From Swiss-Prot:
Signal sequence region: 1-20
PROSITE patterns in the cross-refs: PROTEIN_KINASE_DOM, PROTEIN_KINASE_ST
Spans through the membrane: 137-157
Membrane topology annotation: Single-pass type I membrane protein
Protein name, per record: Activin receptor type-2B
EC numbers: 2.7.11.30
Disulphide-bonded residues: 30-61, 86-105, 92-104, 106-111
Positions that bind ATP: 195-203, 216
Species lineage: Eukaryota, Metazoa, Chordata, Craniata, Vertebrata
Ranges of the Extracellular topological domain: 21-136
Gene, per the UniProt record: acvr2b
Subcellular location: Membrane
Residue ranges of domain Protein kinase in the record: 189-477
């Protein structure tokens, strides 16, 4: 009797401890497998253990595989964190009809050891056929109504398609997504952490199967910006080594909880602004960043009649060009991003929303600050070139090539009017006083930087028509790099007068 009571007490105590421990931490053990273990330098198989300290988070196991003509090719197995699609599933069952990659998840230790594919089958409930007399009555009764409805729908369709292409996008409109990428809808797509916040939303680093991607999430009230950026990305000819790679556009949720996603390539080094804040650049790095940045903007501005078999690529103005919207690859190649304010110039079509004062205030050209814009294609391209001049100055300010100190990173005009200038501050400095960021004296003693400073001045010229084109800037930087790197460090002439003897590409703009 005493032994029985003691055993009961011990069982109750163990149950209490297990229950209290479950409130604090949950543990999940899953079968682990990685088909790309050699490339990712991980184990090929085994057991994965996941511990979560938050009580409201549930832990799951998952499996993903391909079916190649009946041959099952396992892709990955492992632990998965808090997905409502996995709740209360004891077995790992994929229900999609015929995806490119099958995915299933479940709850319970080692529940992903076995996995199956059971597509959902639609049930069909046959109903008795109506008699011939009833059928005739229905046909003769409904035929006029159907005909009238079709006439009304046709008239409405014709009316809508006579409106300009770039009208305001109402929240209940669904303009349709671009042709789906092979990656759209594939699981697992897992948001990892926020990398940036901007005017129209936030950018997440996410994992899509075996690669990292960037997911830009717009709230539903910014649908117009999402729609604009999606249309720019899906314009023919937008695949270029110096433009951000587009993967997919998706809608998540419904009604007021709807989120609008843009999925693009992820670049771990982040923006040019972030890189310059924490790093100095050498002469060769400066040349590589500036030349590839100019190449990307030149291609964006270019009108290509027939681009790589994709159709006509129109000229596109960025309208928010700044160092924050220039990303860097690992080799410091520049990538242009954030086309939420961009505008296309297609022959015979209105350019859409060409409201003058858009973009980031600090990078606005004098004519934008004055509100005196000529709403033509060339005017918008020249506004981008003014902003490029400021970004070039930012890069030069962090270059170690000159024989002198390198200051801490500053935004354009930060030294003159601080970090948060008003529109009136910029109008006074940029428009009325015609002030531009300062060139340090020791920059002008380096032959390459001195020539680049001349190019910068011709980018931010107060007279918009006198500004260089992006293609001319690319060509100039290429020639400057070759002229400087073609001499030895012992033979570099460090006086400004020597710079004036170098033939630069003509100032004539191709805009």
């Amino acid at each position: 009797m005493g032994a029985s009571v003691a055993l009961t007490f011990l069982l109750l105590l163990a149950t209490f401890r297990a229950g209290s421990g479950h409130d604090e931490v949950e543990t999940r053990e899953c079968i682990y497998y990685n088909a790309n273990w050699e490339l990712e330098k991980t184990n090929q198989s085994g057991v994965e253990r996941l511990v979560e300290g938050k009580k409201d988070k549930r832990l799951h196991c998952y499996a993903s595989w391909r079916n190649n003509s009946g041959f099952i090719e396992l892709v990955k197995k492992g632990c998965w964190l808090d997905d409502f699609n996995c709740y209360d599933r004891q077995e790992c069952i994929a229900k999609e009809e015929n995806p490119q990659v099958f995915f299933c998840c479940c709850e319970g230790n080692y529940c992903n050891k076995k996995f199956t594919h059971l597509p959902e089958v639609e049930t069909f409930d046959p109903k008795p056929q109506p008699s011939a007399s009833v059928l005739n009555i229905l046909i003769y009764s409904l035929l006029p109504i159907v005909g009238l409805s079709m006439a009304i729908l046709l008239a409405f369709w014709m009316y809508r398609h006579r409106k300009p292409s770039y009208g305001h996008v109402e929240i209940n409109e669904d303009p349709g997504l671009p042709p789906p990428s092979p990656l759209v809808g594939l699981k697992p797509l897992q948001l990892l952490d926020i990398k940036a916040r901007g005017r129209f939303g936030c950018v997440w680093k996410a994992r899509l199967l075996n690669e990292y991607v960037a997911v830009k999430i717009f709230p539903v009230q910014d649908k117009q910006s999402w729609q604009c950026e999606k249309e720019i990305f899906t314009t023919p000819g937008m695949k270029h080594e110096n433009l951000l790679e587009f993967i997919a556009a998706e809608k998540r949720g419904s009604n007021l909880e709807m989120e609008l996603w843009l999925i693009t390539a992820f670049h771990d080094k982040g923006s040019l602004t972030d890189y310059l804040k924490g790093n100095l650049v050498s002469w060769n790095e400066l040349c590589h960043i500036t030349e590839t940045m100019a190449r990307g903007l030149a291609y964006l501005h270019e009108d290509v009649p027939r681009c790589k078999g994709e159709g006509h690529k129109p000229a596109i103005a960025h309208r928010d060009f700044k160092s924050k919207n220039v990303l860097l690859r690992n080799d410091l190649t520049a990538i242009l991003a954030d086309f939420g304010l961009a505008v296309r110039f297609e022959p015979g079509k209105p350019p859409g929303d060409t409201h003058g004062q858009v973009g980031t205030r600090r990078y606005m050209a004098p004519e934008v600050l004055e509100g005196a814009i000529n709403f033509q294609r060339d005017s918008f391209l020249r506004i981008d070139m003014y902003a490029m001049g400021l970004v070039l100055w930012e890069i030069v300010s962090r270059c170690t090539a000159a024989d002198g100190p390198v200051d801490e990173y500053l935004l354009p005009f930060e030294e003159e009017i601080g970090q948060h200038p008003s529109l009136e501050d910029l109008q006074e400095v940029v428009v009325h006083k015609k002030i531009r960021p300062v060139f340090k004296d020791h920059w002008l003693k380096h032959p390459g930087l001195a020539q680049l400073c001349v190019t910068i001045e011709e980018c931010w010229d107060h007279d918009a028509e006198a500004r260089l084109s992006a293609g001319c800037v690319e060509e100039r930087i290429s020639q400057i790099r070759k002229s400087v790197n073609g001499t030895t460090s012992d033979c570099l002439v460090s006086i400004v007068t020597s710079v004036t003897n170098v033939d630069l590409p003509p100032k004539e703009s191709s805009i």
